[in-house]
């Protein structure tokens, strides 16, 4: 770091800071595709994703998502004592939900309107409560998750931090380290919609 760079205090710190968004994406990906591994001297520890912890509340859609899929799953979860508040789906599934409501037969344009179609869907309302719709690009397109956000989340074991590595030659090396886990309480308070197509 013998050269000063305009707008950058330390190129090394800049590169270390750039690693954190990528690591956060890996954590988000783990929520949907994670598997449990206890770890050993040669195998890294790994935490399971949502599908590992969600219990028996499952609805098999077998095609495009329908409002009845969400309603039936909400009923199952309600009977088991759950009160979910989120519907987490792939963007393609969210578009299909939107298309159930916003079709050309419902579009009306007059002089006071300067847009065509409906805005994005924010909530799915059911007899058993409202679900905030969350689109996530890492969510499998064939699965939707109905979850209680108060009973599911990430736990920080070690926050992200920079650790220096051994010096070789005149180079400076380091790594960004953080350790997180996924907590899910009351597995029957959540559910999945499987077999979705978009």
Predicted regions located by residue number:
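Sequence/fold signature of self-assembling virion shell proteins
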Residues: 44-67, 96-198
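Internal mixed-charge
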Residues: 2, 9-29, 83-86, 91, ...
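Amphipathic interfacial helices
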Residues: 69-87
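Short coil/turn segments at secondary-structure boundaries
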Residues: 32-36, 87-90, 110-113
């Amino acid at each position: 770091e013998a050269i000063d760079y305009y707008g950058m205090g330390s190129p090394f710190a800049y590169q270390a800071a750039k690693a954190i968004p990528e690591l956060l994406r890996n954590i988000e990906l783990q929520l949907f595709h994670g598997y449990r591994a206890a770890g050993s001297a040669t195998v890294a520890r790994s935490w399971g994703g949502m599908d590992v912890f969600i219990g028996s509340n499952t609805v098999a859609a077998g095609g495009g998502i329908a409002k009845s899929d969400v309603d039936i799953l909400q009923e199952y979860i309600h009977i088991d004592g759950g009160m979910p508040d989120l519907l987490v789906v792939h963007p393609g599934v969210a578009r299909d939900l939107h298309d159930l409501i916003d079709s050309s037969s419902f579009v009306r344009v007059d002089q006071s309107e300067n847009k065509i179609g409906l805005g994005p869907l924010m909530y799915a309302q059911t007899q058993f409560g409202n679900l905030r719709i969350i689109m996530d690009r890492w969510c499998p397109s064939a699965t939707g998750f109905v979850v209680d956000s108060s009973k599911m989340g990430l736990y920080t074991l070690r926050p992200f931090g920079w650790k220096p590595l051994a010096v070789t030659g005149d180079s400076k090396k380091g790594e960004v380290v953080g350790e997180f886990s996924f907590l899910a309480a009351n597995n029957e308070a959540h559910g999945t919609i499987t077999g979705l197509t978009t």
